[in-house]
């Protein structure tokens, strides 16, 4: 019998639990647009009461459609309805004293505030984050701003597009081709990422339990730098060169089958060998140069794919265990059997549009079944009495006292443990001497070098503050030791394919027998069930399967995989699910399984594609470097050369308001073409985009990038130099905020590692306190803590159960 493709929202999760994880927490939402709304949506899903405070005109998101669909009077946009389900709306007119007093009363009753820059109410100094916290010192106040609340750029104009450029994310891991402009990641992803970080920061500050409140300062620039690049500063510091010097398109990558687009990839050397056999060219395996220079093979691979249907390509790739996925978009997403089986998409209770379901699933507690998003000012009277919740223990850092067994590898899983470790948790990173974390070997360090496995820059950046343990749990003695460690841990995080732990007797049901209150986070690529359950998942495949790839690239070419975002985004959402499970355990003493599927997390931040198609029949697609938020918006080549002497310097310009257009005109010297009246409004500029682009390109080509940035910023226009990722460290704003910290490593020396894109007012000190662990560095320490004596530990090493050197499998 066919599985229903969608589910009603009230059926998303069981609804019989007496309390939700965040029951009793009240959050006042003083934000506009996507980032703040997504933050509070995630909190609302967890059971928090969200009171959205709006000026009389309402949040501009109410009338937003990325496809320019007409929102009838009295209705709200479908994206607004998705992001604001289960919230309350209160109108506060800043010009009315009674309303101002009412807002103060509301803030007194709250536990937290989420704030972003916006019109009217939020421009009042008294309603800025410092003013709110000063008047209501019990609150956790989370601010979301382009550059952070302090620093030389804190008041500079920016858009999500220009922030991608500043943070290096517009280049990413050398995305694109050298003969064209770079291409940004479409879909306003930076706003969604900032919203997820804001949710993590808010929950972490609430968990700390300090009675004096806290300011959590989220920087969208730092969020983009964290998630849209691959630790490029640490990479260059350690190895002396950037990961790549030229843009490129992966081969294999996005391929055109006879009836649609598919994504293929080779994340390991073995997968490349298998791919060569699959496409009928085993001779490619004999030429090691082709492994690194595969672009020459692209036409042959394209011809192979073109002779097959999507289903045939995907089936063959699955048979060879080659990472694969269809290229998903808003029109086809809900048609795939895997998503139908898992009921990934749900119907919105207000407008009936398709929405992605929550990005994680919890076994022992519920998420709130969403109720319709509120009309503007729908709740005119609210209870004034603050809800008293159980007193929370006070912690030096948000996760002090939490012990975590980190059974993860590469990026998505270790990212979870890294955030926990930076914020105080005792995180034990588990590897084996025969199968270390694969990211240790990313970077191209020759295996002829001594201790080559200790020189991976990505591992060094992603695992600071952790302790390192090696255990071969394929051996029964190793598996037994894992279980013994679990008895001492609050949390286990793992990101193997589902069958690995299931076959090892280390699944949740087995581990909860030895630790009943265990919180276990499982991070499969596609879920613990469904047709794609056992498919290998790398970041680029998750991007293909979620719509991230579809929105990235030039409209006259195949889409480009962002090639990084799928991993850290999965880690962000797993962290939120984990924090909700911990809140549930704090209330009830009950453990929980958190299923934080990578593709579900990605589908949430690309929700707009499915929503627009379902609600309006609109097909959202990639537009190069243009976008729905601004016109003109594009990259323009500047004068000068890059650090390798190439004519490849670009600036990003985005005019999001009419006022900014007038500023741009002044910066240009008010040339006659720019004074045409049709350009005074967004619609006219959008229609004349080609003409404006040509004029701006000519103006920029005659000027250095820094000169362009200075002129346009002075005129109030969002602008950025397109930064090479490893040059993040040159940004004065990041330097002012201490985004990078120096970390000493016993093998590779001193390098700079990024911190987190949020600052906690009660944790001003450095975040990095220990270098990433050497392989098995803390074996003796940890096994001794477990009660093993030196003779037992020596025997384990002699038998290869533990080790401190990389060895070939026995």
Task: Give, region by region, the residue ranges found by the protein language model.
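Substrate-binding/catalytic subdomain of NAD(P)-dependent oxidoreductase enzymes
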Residues: 205-242, 326, 330, 581-625, ...
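Aromatic-enriched alpha-helical interface/lid elements that frame and gate functional surfaces
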Residues: 246, 250-320, 324, 331, ...
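A glycine-rich dinucleotide-binding beta-alpha-beta segment and adjacent secondary-structure elements
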Residues: 319-370, 714-768, 808
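Glycine-rich beta-alpha junction loops
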Residues: 57, 146-148, 220-226, 259, ...
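Short linear loop/turn motifs
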Residues: 286-298, 328-337, 353, 675-687, ...
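A short glycine-threonine-serine/GTX helix/turn-capping micro-motif
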Residues: 182-193, 243, 249-252, 261-263, ...
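Short Gly/Pro-enriched turn/cap motifs at secondary-structure boundaries
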Residues: 80, 242-247, 252-253, 350-353, ...
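N-terminal helix-loop segment corresponding to the beta1-alpha1 unit
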Residues: 2-212, 236, 303, 311, ...
């Amino acid at each position: 019998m066919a599985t229903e493709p969608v589910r009603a929202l009230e059926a998303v999760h069981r609804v019989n639990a007496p309390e939700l994880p965040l029951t009793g927490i009240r959050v006042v939402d003083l934000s506009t647009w996507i980032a703040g709304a997504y933050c509070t949506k995630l909190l609302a899903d967890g059971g928090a009461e969200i009171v959205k405070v709006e000026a009389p005109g309402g949040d501009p998101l109410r009338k937003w459609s990325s496809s320019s669909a007409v929102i009838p009077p009295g209705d709200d946009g479908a994206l607004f309805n998705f992001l604001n389900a289960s919230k309350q709306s209160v109108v506060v007119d800043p010009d009315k004293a009674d309303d101002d007093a009412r807002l103060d009363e509301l803030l007194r009753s709250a536990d937290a505030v989420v704030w972003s820059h916006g019109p009217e109410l939020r421009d009042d100094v008294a309603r800025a984050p410092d003013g709110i916290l000063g008047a209501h010192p019990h609150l956790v106040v989370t601010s979301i701003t382009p550059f952070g609340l302090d620093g030389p750029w804190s008041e500079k104009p920016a858009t999500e597009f220009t922030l991608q450029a500043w943070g290096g994310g517009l280049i990413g891991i050398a995305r694109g081709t050298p003969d064209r402009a770079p291409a940004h990641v479409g879909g306003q992803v930076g706003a969604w990422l900032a919203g997820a970080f804001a949710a993590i920061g808010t929950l972490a500050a609430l968990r700390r339990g300090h009675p004096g409140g806290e300011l959590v300062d989220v920087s969208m620039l730092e969020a983009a730098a964290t998630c849209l690049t691959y630790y490029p500063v640490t990479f260059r510091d350690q190895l002396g060169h950037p990961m790549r010097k030229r843009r490129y398109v992966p081969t294999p990558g996005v391929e055109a089958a006879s009836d649609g687009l598919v994504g293929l990839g080779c994340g390991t050397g073995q997968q490349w060998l298998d791919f060569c056999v699959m496409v009928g060219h085993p001779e490619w395996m004999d030429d090691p140069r082709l492994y690194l220079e595969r672009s020459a093979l692209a036409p042959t691979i394209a011809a192979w794919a073109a002779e097959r249907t999507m289903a045939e390509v995907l089936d063959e790739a699955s048979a060879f265990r080659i990472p694969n996925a269809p290229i998903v978009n808003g029109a086809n997403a809900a048609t795939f059997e895997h998503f139908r089986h898992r009921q990934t998409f749900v119907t919105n209770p207000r407008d009936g549009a398709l929405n992605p379901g929550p990005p994680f699933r919890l076994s022992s507690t519920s998420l709130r079944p969403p109720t319709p998003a509120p009309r503007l000012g729908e709740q005119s009277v609210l209870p004034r009495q603050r809800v008293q919740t159980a007193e929370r223990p006070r912690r030096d850092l948000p996760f002090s006292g939490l012990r975590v067994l980190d059974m993860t590898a590469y990026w998505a899983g270790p990212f979870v443990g890294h955030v926990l470790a930076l914020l105080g948790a005792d995180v034990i990173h588990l590897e084996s001497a025969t199968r270390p974390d694969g990211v240790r070997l990313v970077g191209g360090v020759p295996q002829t070098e001594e201790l080559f496995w200790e020189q991976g820059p990505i591992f060094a950046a992603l695992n600071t503050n952790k302790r390192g343990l090696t255990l071969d749990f394929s051996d029964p003695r190793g598996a037994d030791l894992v279980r013994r460690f679990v008895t001492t841990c609050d949390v286990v995080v793992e990101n193997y394919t589902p069958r690995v732990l299931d076959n090892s007797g280390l699944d949740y049901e087995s581990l909860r027998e030895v630790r009943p209150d265990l919180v276990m986070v499982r991070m499969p690529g596609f879920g613990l069930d469904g047709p794609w359950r056992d498919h290998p998942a790398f970041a680029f495949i998750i991007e293909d399967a979620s719509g991230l790839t579809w929105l990235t690239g030039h409209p006259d070419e195949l889409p480009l995989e962002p090639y990084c975002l799928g991993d850290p985004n999965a880690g962000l959402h797993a962290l939120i699910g984990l924090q909700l499970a911990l809140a549930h355990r704090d209330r009830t003493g009950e453990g929980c399984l958190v299923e934080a599927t990578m593709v579900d997390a990605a589908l949430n931040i690309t929700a707009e594609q499915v929503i627009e198609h379902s609600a309006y029949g609109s097909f959202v697609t990639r537009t190069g470097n243009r976008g729905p938020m601004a016109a003109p918006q594009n990259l323009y080549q500047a004068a000068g050369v890059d650090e390798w002497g190439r004519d490849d310097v670009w600036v990003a310009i985005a005019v999001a308001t009419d006022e900014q257009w007038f500023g741009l005109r002044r910066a240009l010297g008010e040339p006659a073409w720019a004074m045409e009246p049709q350009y005074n409004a967004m619609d006219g500029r959008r229609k004349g985009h080609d003409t404006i682009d040509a004029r701006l390109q000519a103006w920029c080509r005659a000027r250095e990038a820094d000169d362009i940035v200075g002129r346009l910023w002075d005129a109030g226009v969002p602008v950025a130099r397109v930064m090479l990722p490893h040059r993040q460290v040159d940004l004065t704003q990041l330097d002012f905020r201490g985004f990078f910290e120096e970390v000493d490593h016993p093998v590779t020396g001193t390098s700079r590692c990024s911190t987190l894109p949020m600052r906690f007012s009660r944790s001003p000190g450095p975040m990095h306190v220990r270098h990433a662990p050497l392989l098995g560095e803390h074996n003796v320490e940890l096994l001794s803590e477990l009660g093993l004596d030196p003779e037992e530990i020596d025997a384990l090493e002699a038998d290869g159960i533990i080790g401190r050197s990389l060895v070939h499998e026995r």
